[in-house]
Amino acid sequence: MRVLADMTGNVTPTEGDGGDVRSVAVVGAGVTGLVAAYELRRRGVNVTLYEASGHAGGAIRTTHADGFLAEHGPNSFVTSAAVDTLLQQLDLQDDVVEANPEANKRYVVRSSVMTPFPLTPGAMLGTSLLSFKAKLRVLLEPLVRTRTQDTDESVASFVRRRLGHEVLDYAVDPFISGIFAGDPETLSMAHAFPRVAELERQYGSLSKGLMMQRKRFSSGETNPATHEGHLTSSPAARARLISFVDGMQTLTDALEASIAGTLRLGCPVRLVHRQEGRWVVDAGQDGAARSRTVDAVVMATPAHVLAAMEMPAPMRKFAAPIERVEYPPVSTLTLGFRREDVAHRLDGFGVLVPAAERRNILGALFSSSLFPSRAPDDCVTITCFVGGSRQAERAREDTDLLVERVLLDLRQLLGVRGEPVFAKHVYWPRAIPQYTVGYQAVKDAADTTEQQNPGLYLAGNYRNGVSVGDCVASGQQVAERVASYLTRAG
């Protein structure tokens, strides 16, 4: 990896609050905050990036041990025009690894049997994952009436209405677990999967909408392959599922290196308030807190961190709905096995487990099948996910009990025989924001908070999508909005 602090042509501003250089505080050094700070610094803005913990990157962190690679959080992400631009600016193209095209199977468990998820209409007709009755229900989807009520609808209600309960249980439910670790009965269709909801509104049918999208894509009009459609980008090259040779932390390490001198680790922000048209940020540990006056503030923290921060009463009133965003706990358990101790070929992306199967795991990634350098040559790596909205108590279990429960599933589903030769357990007490029914109140609160507090900006995965690509785009977009504000403010 070749990263220099100013390799992208950054203007490196001098320290201090005075002079002609505009100053911005970015709070939270996850992907969104890092990208926002990077983009602002490229524009010549004097940036200070505050991070309460001892490391940057948020949920992205990579452990290397005994020839194994374990991701603490995201294992991969989908590229877009915005992502490709960032990778080029950071000179990371040579570090990128694309997912193995031969590992494109997604297995789903039904009746304790792993079945490839059908990815084409022909495969759907032939799959054993759905009954004949369920397949017929899917084929009749264009005849289902369009919903006329304008109220928010849960994912479960939407899918049952258009495709039937079996598709919900064995096609949609497991993917909800894979993306949100959530419950389709409580997640909002309009906010968790806005593009899919829009297909019904625009075309009256999901089937018709998908056919129209494919037709438009083949003519070069749009790119429908981006993640869930939370943040669209301009048409670009083929979307790719990628990681990096040395793991996902390569991205956040490169961003951190590119903004050298701006990052304050172990420096929690305690108070943000407006004073004489500017913003005062109080940050630091007990006894070492310092104030800094800046022209604008980007809050790139999770919603629950925002809730714990001191702020003036009027600001808290506007932000109140944001503080109620739910974050269920999730544990990731990366296990390494000798190849001969796993009967299954691991010839795919991984396996997802519907809630109806009543298993211990939400799903598992076949990490060493997906990307190289994830395990020694004679071993394999499997990354398992436990907990989420419907099994929160499982995520909180200690490592020994968690390994025991997970091994029970892996032995039955994958034919695992021996004990793991590597294990890495990471517990996330608040993992992924849940875009629940009524989530428009959260988005409205964020908009109102910004409107009532000029120079204050809210960003992060509770606003515009939970994927790494969404967070990259969110950081880029908030930096653009801040830069426009600074220009208008003179």
Where are these regions (language model features)?
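Active-site/ligand-binding neighborhood in enzyme catalytic cores
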Residues: 138-271, 293
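Conserved flavin/dinucleotide-binding core of flavoenzymes
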Residues: 2-13, 17, 118-122, 346-348, ...
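Mid-domain catalytic core of redox enzymes
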Residues: 2, 19-20, 43, 265-382, ...
